[in-house]
């Protein structure tokens, strides 16, 4: 429990927002499994009430339906629909994506200019999505680090950008 508390403190989201984000993720995942089953492979990532959808759907219509359904959920402020209408990815592709995510997170931890606990890394088909509450300078460092990881095809920013003053305020409030 102490470890979890430390992560909450380092996260720039307040504990209430973190809880809302987790609730959105769980609700969306449960809904998608029940409604679409094996017709989709959707990863739901939530940061600061903004939802990133990655993965595959069997048709373009399903891609649109999934995004619309999630957008209508309580507490969701934005949906970034990065789903593709394609055959569902296999274990090998998903394992490679998990490996890339781990490599990027490790590189972030090694750089004091990246607030790794205020960021989320999502990888799908070699494309990396970075979410979080960061300054423009932090975003640029994170993007450059992610781009340098072998196997990364593309890096997309899904950040909430804040000023240096907001960074100091948020970091101070969470100590």
Q: Which residues does each predicted region cover?
A:
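N-terminal targeting leaders
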Residues: 1-175
